[in-house]
């Protein structure tokens, strides 16, 4: 019974942590990675992975939802493309 309560509490805390956050995913030319990353706050560090075209990278991060309106135009100006914004259910 105690384990079940702890499990529910963990999931509730995770849902509360995600309440004011969104995830951003974008494509970035490899040459523009540093300027784009410098704009991004994140929980730790953004996730970066190579696309099939090695001159491009996929970048994913979590940010405060209130910052997105100002952040997306700056990311675009720094070279990011194909920017996706999506809600989070939980952050553990």
Residue ranges of model-derived segments:
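Small-molecule-sensing regulatory modules
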Residues: 1-92
């Amino acid at each position: 019974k105690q384990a079940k309560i702890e499990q529910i509490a963990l999931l509730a805390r995770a849902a509360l942590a995600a309440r004011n956050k969104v995830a951003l995913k974008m494509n970035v030319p490899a040459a523009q990675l540093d300027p784009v990353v410098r704009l991004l706050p994140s929980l730790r560090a953004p996730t970066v992975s190579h696309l099939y075209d090695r001159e491009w990278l996929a970048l994913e991060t979590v940010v405060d939802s209130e910052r997105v309106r100002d952040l997306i135009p700056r990311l675009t100006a720094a070279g990011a493309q194909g920017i996706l914004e999506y809600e989070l259910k939980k952050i553990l």
